[in-house]
Amino acid sequence: MYNLRNQILLGVLTLCCASTSASGIHDSRHASTSGSETILHAWTWSFDTIAANMHDIAAAGYTYVQTSPAQACYIGDGGGTALYSTPEDSVKGKWYYYYQPTDWTIGNYMLGNRNSFKAMCDSAYKYGVRILVDVLPNHTAIDHHAVLPTLDAAVGGHENLYHANGFNEITDYNNRYQCTTGQMGGLPDVNTENPDFQYYYLQYVNDLINLGARGFRYDTAKHIGLPSDPLDAKSTCNDFWDIATGRKAVKGLSLLMPDSLYIYGEILQDRNTKETEYAEYVDQTASSYGQVLRQALANGNAKDIDLSQWYHPVNAQHLVTWVESHDTYCNEHISAALTNDQIRMGWVIIAARATGRPLFYSRPEGSSTTNIWGTNRIGARGNDKFRHPEVVAVNIFRKDMAGQPETITTTDDGTVVQVARGNRGIALVNISGKSHKFKMPTTLPDGTYTDAVHGKNFKVYKGILSGKVDFLTSYLLTAE
């Protein structure tokens, strides 16, 4: 208890002050599976902004920083830097333009150039943080005529860049042919099985690695075909994932240092997602668990909700977990109604767990439930909730408890969630909007415990934990 509390105080005080070719078969899903990793999604932060805040990121206990897409992208709204503008706004822009590639080279007008990317990676290395880059080989910009000539030339002409079915809109996302070859939301589908494209794209990925990237998040991963999926008329083999994870070379080129990378895919769960087959190549997102957790947070209790299950067929060791993602916040705003305090309670639950690799989505600076875009600027740092003392505390707790088993229980009314890690420590989370006294069984030995953040005392007697919890507050208790 003393060590944890002092580590947290040190972290908070610190915050306030301030190439080998692939061969054979590789498992690039997890460079480390110690159960101590955490990811900060520095959403729309520029490379310079991430570098400038790397000290604070490391002090807050994160082991990875995930950037937004780094490749050349569509220049919309005159190159404006608003996260999301309306016709009345003087500064225009849309955050999603960087999800519309025009070439696969490093640097874009929204986040920074190649030199800024390198400086960010150098800063991360200095502080022992690893850089994950959001990559998206599945599609190009809606305006496909904006694709740069260098990309067209690299793939043998514009007509060879896309699947034969690549301009037909998906109408059934559970139809694997449509899902993996068709146009999604107006975004034309790239022929990811074209060896010329694979070679060009892999050059981009290897360039990122040479500059210091140590992992990748594959956007729209379930829209890129698996070996068992139907072939597009222009394709002879669905081998993209073999190449992207270093199992196979293309035109003599292989993924660099595949055994040292962490790779996961955005594979949103549905009726025909093929999670177990994707798991042969990449880790994946536990989107259903996030939905269940948000429901408990919205309810203010987890009664009749099982938070111990992951709602996923893949071992939780290979899942990226979240309370919310940039999609749940920005697209249909399905998580935007949750307050920062509610999101933090969810974070403590997933970060205290033994498995999964939790990702903390950084909301925009100045945002609220009534103003989701906040100060509304691309490139700026998000709000400071990523380094809240309770967040720092559970990030440290996660590292200290690595290897310990977990048990998740709730009070009878479901308002207090306990994540126990063996008999060494617990995270106690009041997800309700009321302060109240409680009693519940625990794995902690009998004794009096002082919370590491707030200094509040709790008592364990004959295996029963008791005390008073404040509304939307978390506590961390550890045995001596």
Name these PLM-found stretches:
Residues 39-48, 187-199:
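Active-site mouth loops of central-metabolism enzymes
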